[in-house]
UniProtKB/Swiss-Prot annotation:
Involved in the gluconeogenesis. Catalyzes the conversion of oxaloacetate (OAA) to phosphoenolpyruvate (PEP) through direct phosphoryl transfer between the nucleoside triphosphate and OAA. Gene3D superfamilies: 3.90.228.20, Phosphoenolpyruvate Carboxykinase, domain 1, Phosphoenolpyruvate Carboxykinase, domain 2. Mn(2+) binds at K201, H220, D257. One of its GO terms (molecular function) is ATP binding. It comes from Staphylococcus aureus (strain NCTC 8325 / PS 47). Substrate binds at R58, Y195, K201, R321. This is Phosphoenolpyruvate carboxykinase (ATP). It catalyses: oxaloacetate + ATP = phosphoenolpyruvate + ADP + CO2. SUPFAM superfamilies: PEP carboxykinase N-terminal domain, PEP carboxykinase-like. Its cofactor is Mn(2+). Keywords: ATP-binding, Cytoplasm, Decarboxylase, Gluconeogenesis, Lyase, Manganese, Metal-binding, Nucleotide-binding. The keyword Metal-binding applies. It is found in: Cytoplasm. The gene is pckA. GO terms for biological process: gluconeogenesis.
Length: 530
């Protein structure tokens, strides 16, 4: 054991043994601490609402992986996976541990990530804030008892000090905020941000390194299972309908965001859900609304003096959130795992109005679209966006995947082949013209298409190959107008459709160039018109 490792272990032990380090508090005890410390307010729904301050989302430019000899050759370094040297990390780590040692109170949670016993990650989470500790308790997998928690010897430790601000010139960071992952020291170090989602996504990034090393696929997707045991996975970026479409009263939820896929099937990495809360209503999303009760956390929502919550008010952020244990939802699988998937749905919101509402993909096309991770940024969603812009996020979650994208794509291709999985590309965006001209595809029609795909009714249906993209489109789907199935038919100006489609194809091709020679085999067989 090196001197540094010995020192940090001693400091961690010292923090854990402090009389004012509260270990494995109950939800009620954490509520009392949150309210006593003025960290949040109680809402009429029973949930507490907390503010994350100026950081209302993740800080991807402030996230680093420590460049360590045993790990550095595996990481796909670049703008997303940024390196920081070990010496710089250790200096900052010790500063944070010394800072936390001076705090009057700390909060400690022990639990797990990964509902598969063979690959379960044992966790210790050390928090400066009580509401962050409740977040960890809600989002990670909880031990059955406090006694079980005391026996957990962690594989990874999260050290979260949101009120510690880094000095970039001294500490080697880019700003006051930092999220640093060290595989050698088995630590996620977080400071300078109160956005609790950094803890959840930090562990997800760790699992996205560790699982593929054991030939286990890790995925940014939601998952559910039908009455007959049929499993469906939903991949998609923000605004594509992933949460809405996977919340189905006739199917049980496995998980809403992070999963692994091993030799036994699919398993949830988490023990909770982190749902978007903007414009939430009981009518539109009853499962999520009903889950926001005692024990849940709301982030950055607007709460009136009487405790009522205005979910439509975005004065603090569009990214309001609700974090709650998965057992706040009635319709779940216990434990959170199931058999191999029968169906995979890739969701995209095409604001150009040219991608078919649903198409069946072969394995090569599936790998191509998985690597592309396409959706659209719409006018108004970001400053300066006045026209729809294509947005590509590798593996439908580029910020969370440390290895080269082909590692995940190749694993996916092998699993699709091995288990004969049906893969569909579903466009929840526009039809009959681009955003501003055409109209959004009806949610009713999208649900019908997804339900038909998941039920297996489209497996052996009749398909036609569209001349523009080379995608296989169902000739007909029950209760869905034929006119929208092939997008060119919904456009009054066919030449405009062809020009818009060709423009999008070129953008896909340009995006794919970033992967280099490693993906030539996928581009050759899986791209449009192939």
């Amino acid at each position: 054991m090196s001197v540094d490792t010995y020192t940090e272990t001693t400091k961690i032990d010292k923090l854990l043994k402090k009389p004012t380090s509260h270990f494995q508090l109950s939800t009620t005890q954490l509520y009392n601490k949150i309210l006593d410390n003025n960290e949040g307010v109680l809402t009429e729904l029973g949930a507490v609402n907390a503010s994350t301050g100026k950081y209302t989302g993740r800080s991807p430019k402030d996230k680093f992986f420590v460049s360590e000899p045993s790990y550095r050759d595996n990481i796909d370094w670049g703008e997303i996976n940024q390196p920081i040297d070990e010496e710089t990390f250790l200096k900052l780590y010790h500063k944070v541990l010394d800072y936390l040692d001076k705090k009057d109170e700390l909060y400690v949670f022990k639990g797990y990530a990964g509902s598969d016993k063979d690959t379960m990650l044992k966790l210790t989470v050390i928090n400066e804030l009580a509401w962050h500790n409740l977040f960890a308790k809600n989002m990670f997998i909880r031990p059955e008892s406090k006694e079980e928690a005391t026996k957990i010897k962690p594989n990874f430790t999260i050290v979260s000090a949101p009120h510690f601000k880094a000095d970039p010139e001294v500490d080697g960071t880019k700003s006051e905020t930092f999220v640093i992952i060290s595989f050698k020291h088995k630590v996620i170090l977080i400071g300078g941000t109160e956005y609790a989602g950094e803890m959840k996504k930090g562990i997800f990034s760790v699992m996205n390194y560790l699982l593929p090393m054991q030939d286990i696929m890790s995925m940014h997707c939601s998952a559910n299972v039908g009455e007959k045991g049929d499993v469906a996975l939903f991949f998609g970026l923000s605004g594509t309908g992933k949460t809405t479409l996977s919340a189905d009263p006739h199917r049980k939820l496995i998980g809403d965001d992070e999963h692994g896929w091993n030799k036994n099937g699919v398993f949830n990495i988490e023990g909770g859900c982190y749902a978007k809360a903007i414009n939430l209503s009981k009518e539109k999303e009853p499962q999520i609304f009903d889950a926001i009760k005692y024990g849940a956390i709301l982030e950055n929502t607007v709460v009136a003096e009487d405790g009522s919550v205005d979910f439509e008010d975005n004065r603090y952020t569009e990214n309001t959130r609700a974090a709650y244990p998965i057992n706040h939802i009635d319709n779940i699988v216990v434990p959170s795992k199931a058999a191999h998937p029968n169906t995979i749905i890739f969701l995209t919101a095409d604001a150009f109005g040219v991608i078919p509402p649903i198409s069946k993909l072969n394995k090569d096309q599936a790998m191509y679209h998985f690597l592309s991770g396409f959706t659209s940024k719409l006018a108004g969603t970001e400053r300066g966006v006045t026209e729809p812009e294509p947005s590509f996020s590798t593996c439908f979650g580029a910020p969370f995947f440390p290895l080269h994208p082909t590692v995940y794509a190749d694993l996916l291709g092998e699993l699709i082949d091995l288990h004969d999985v049906d893969v569909y590309l579903v466009n929840t965006g526009w039809t009959g013209g681009k955003y501003g001209v055409g109209r959004r595809i009806s949610l009713h029609y999208t649900r019908q298409m997804v339900n038909q795909a998941i039920s297996g009714k489209l497996k052996n249906a009749e398909y036609t190959k569209d001349s523009t993209f080379g995608l296989s489109i169902p000739v007909e789907i029950e209760d869905v107008p034929k006119t929208i199935l092939n997008p060119i038919n919904a456009w009054s100006d066919k030449e405009k459709y062809k020009a818009q489609a060709e423009d999008l194809i070129q953008r896909f091709e340009k995006n794919f160039e970033k992967f280099g020679e490693k993906v030539e085999h996928i581009a050759e067989k899986g791209s449009f018109n192939k």
